[in-house]
Amino acid sequence: MGPFKSSVFILILHLLEGALSDSLIQLNNNGYEGIVIAIDPNVPEDETLIQQIKDMVTQASPYLFEATGKRFYFKNVAILIPETWKTKADYVRPKLETYKNADVLVAESTPSGGDEPYTEHIGKCGDQGERIHLTPHFLAGKQLKEYGPQGRAFVHEWAHLRWGVFDEYNNDEKFYLSNGRIQAVRCSVGITGKIEVNKCQGGSCYTKRCTFNKATGLYEKGCEFIPHSQQTEKASIMFAQHVDSVVEFCTEQNHNKEAPNMQNTKCNLRSTWEVIRDSEDFKKTTPTTTQPPNPTFSLLQIGQRIVCLVLDKSGSMATGNRLNRLNQAGQLFLLQIIELRSWVGMVTFDSAAHVQSELIQINSGSDRDTLTKRLPTAASGGTSICSGLRLAFTVIKKKYPTDGSEIVLLTDGEDNTISGCFNEVKQSGAIIHTVALGPSAARELEELSKMTGGLQTYASDQVQNNGLIDAFGALSSGNGVVSERSIQLESKGSTLQNSQWMNGTVIVDSTVGKDTLFLVTWTTQPPQILLWDPSGQKQDGFVVDKNTKMAFLQIPGIAKVGTWKYSLQASSQTLTLTVTSRASSATLPPITVTSKMNKDTGKFPSPMIVYANIRQGASPILRASVTALIESENGKTVTLELLDNGAGADAAKDDGVYSRYFTTYDTNGRYSVKVRALGGVNAVRRRAIPQQSGVMYIPGWIENDEIQWNPPRPEIEDDVQRKQVCFSRTSSGGSFVASGVPNAPIPDLFPPCQITDLKAEIHGHSLINLTWTAPGDDYDHGTAHKYIIRISTSILDLRDKFNESLQVNTTALIPKEANSEEVFLFKPENITFENGTDLFIAIQAVDKVDLKSEISNIARVSLFIPPQTPPETPSPDETSAPCPNISINSTIPGIHILKIMWKWIGELQLSIG
């Protein structure tokens, strides 16, 4: 198979597989249903906010409808209201809607982040985003001058979220050279406006025409392009949706392919409409001739958490210590994970189902102890999963409707009748979290999680990997305030021989420490357990349960901040250590790690991507050491270092999202994912997320031919807080299912990953310096075999006819290991490279079996040689009005006459006579 066919094959596989998304959105007869807009629990109660959300969506719907050629509109929206707000008659309990699967989050503005609407987008072009972020101030219309009408801004963000398009402006590079002329970064180029700069000194500001930087040929820093208020151009929404005439997305006919913006960089110069047209939404709809109705809204208020454990006690649970491991994990969940004031019930099943506990509200430690005593202790019989689910629904209905309740379903066995209760599950409104234990658990299990928005996890029989405890530890509430959720600090295991020691440390940072629990498990005999706090004081008092083979220590109050040390000693058995805690304060956001795969199914040879999002509130944590442990059904564990370098699988550098490709499949079936994150000497906190996908801040507008300026956009410059952040966390990334994996030896079908951060600079007037992050032999792993670099004076020829473009001599360029920085200096040959020339450059990496990567992002250099004589004044629309010659004669005692002549904008001639 040739490299081009291989790339197409991988692309097709990617399109066939559904991306992993928590969203409940469905497209039905051109209308989007199931949109969830959640109001953050920390937002003060304000009923007008609900009406403002309704107004925004209602205004956005017809704008979206017209912008997409009468194809899409907003049909119904659920607004999720915090539990702490007063209850009202028209507020109902949610079903599957949670904060976890919310498409839009309304949260208070941050001191550094401001009120800028933005969308989390960790994937590639065309991949759906994570969620839209809005603030109450924005919704209240207090940012109209800065971001434009709320409805239009929402459509801009919706395009990021739903179709994976990017912005067509550039806050860092607002102008570029094209054929020797300065152009504003915009789409389309038909948008006209003024180019001026607003200078402020002391308490006063004034507007002046922009001056040129004679070294670059571009405008000075601070220069802004302000669109005229009266326009005829209709595109583009991803550039300036606030302009009245803009009602469309850029198409291939009017798209500005040369503009250095994220849409061109990420989407291979394609217009936003081309990306939208390739979406599944577009493919399964046709334009409608009827005007859509206004959106409808449902008001949902979060209530108390209701959970029923549905636990397998069939005969197979007696093998491999599974039933005892279930007891250990179940005790952790009941003693530590489940939050106060929650309701918990318990059902077990074999060939039939049995109630172990009706719903009990967790108000004290004794309530927790009561439930732990109901965990199953004997295993026998067959496996009837539907019996367990039906009985769980009955248990819940005795006190509450099943809407919004949660079921934790654990099983290790096969059950070919499980699909018989799928309809009952769908109609219940309950969320089902599944835990598949061992290699024989029912293959239909994941369907229950998918159809209800629950978490799917897998635990192998490899006890030292602590998978079952990790699965139950991941079941903290998806709703409520983050300060009440359990946070896992450590999860570790080891098989010890001959009185060996398992030594280690756990960091308790200042953001956690409440309800801290150390849990130790073993497989045969109680080990020696030694634990010291950061001051060196030995901690005694572990509660030992020899029957369940576990011991735990609850630290009273707030655990001391610092490094806790432990030593565990045993012979011929496997030990595990788990440490959990909660936020130390309701007002100090804890550091959290959220991990996931990009898909819940993987088909060889399509790669998977593992993500870990590390935050303290809205602030990303940078430079942490992050590793993913991915375990297959064979028991083989692969360790991946996750990176936040903006290369390979990672979409953006220094945004707190760490990513890596996974390609080392070894078998078909389930894989579990666990992420470990450590913050030490290098880890730091960033005040805000660098904007990737958001509405453009409007620098000003034109009124009566004069620019009215907004305050300068709040800059996030040098915002990394230098104080190091020390912490330790572990996080379950759930599980995924692989198929199509051939028997060993597994063939090499993985090419190098695409280079996405190619940059080019001119050195002198003839040399070009390239920098990029090295790809690997298999995506972002290993070392590529060679690079192919090609250049062209036509950006489209380079994209569409790469193999026909002029090749650069790279004989001396030896690829480095993946994720290293590459630097290459060359002189363009056999091509005209003179003043005013625009040169475009792209790279392709090749591996040892001649598989080729996708062509890189296209870098651009424009050769500008400063003129010896003043250039002509550019046109007013594209730059500014001509500046008249000014001559000032001044005679001052003791000083010669000073003459100033402005020869051309940007050149100041001084002569002293």
Swiss-Prot record:
The active site is at E157. Residues 866-885 are annotated as: Disordered. Glycans are attached at N503, N769, N803, N809, N830, N835, N885, N889. InterPro entries: CLCA_chordata, CLCA_N, CLCR, VWF_A, vWFA_dom_sf. Zn(2+) binds at H156, H160, D167. Keywords: Autocatalytic cleavage, Calcium, Calcium transport, Chloride, Glycoprotein, Hydrolase, Ion transport, Metal-binding, Metalloprotease, Protease, Secreted, Signal, Transport, Zinc. Pfam families: CLCA (PF08434), VWA_2 (PF13519). The metalloprotease region is responsible for autoproteolytic processing. It can also cross-cleave other CLCA substrates. This is Calcium-activated chloride channel regulator 1. It comes from Macaca mulatta.
